[in-house]
């Protein structure tokens, strides 16, 4: 569940940051660090980096966005609470009737999917219902409250 939560939040942050800073979402790549508590401290971290080649300061522009992480997080949570394909998207569970989507919960091209080069897991293992309350799911599943 922790990985699904981190991965879904990462995609929401990629979209939020790309809308604000001008980088296309396809040029922002994720790296997820997630490990359970097995005698060691549990690990849960997201690294977003730009993969676009360009003029000096390409990475600097993305680094600057770290100072606005609160704003990006709020915007990401707002974006995750509703999808253009709700209630169909929001009500989907990994155990649902759609065998081809057994690795996704509430996730689709309208809300969580990003360009495949940006995603280290090829848009699998995603569920925005674990991040924020969505239509068709128990709100207690969500880590964050409704924005």
Residue positions per predicted region:
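C-terminal accessory domains/tails appended to large, multi-domain proteins
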Residues: 1-147
């Amino acid at each position: 569940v922790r990985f699904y939560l981190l991965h879904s939040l990462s995609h929401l942050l990629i979209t939020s940051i790309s809308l604000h800073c001008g980088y296309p979402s396809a040029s922002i790549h994720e790296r997820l660090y997630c490990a359970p508590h097995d005698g060691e401290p549990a690990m849960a971290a997201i690294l977003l980096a730009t993969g676009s080649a360009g003029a000096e300061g390409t990475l600097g522009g993305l680094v600057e966005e770290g100072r606005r992480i609160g704003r990006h997080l709020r915007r990401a949570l707002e974006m995750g609470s509703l999808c253009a394909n709700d209630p169909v998207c929001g009500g989907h569970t990994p155990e649902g009737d759609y065998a081809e989507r057994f690795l996704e919960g509430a996730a689709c091209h309208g809300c969580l999917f990003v360009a495949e080069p940006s995603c280290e897991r090829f848009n699998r293992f995603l569920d925005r219902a674990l991040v924020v309350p969505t239509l068709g799911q128990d709100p207690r599943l969500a880590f964050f409250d409704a924005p």
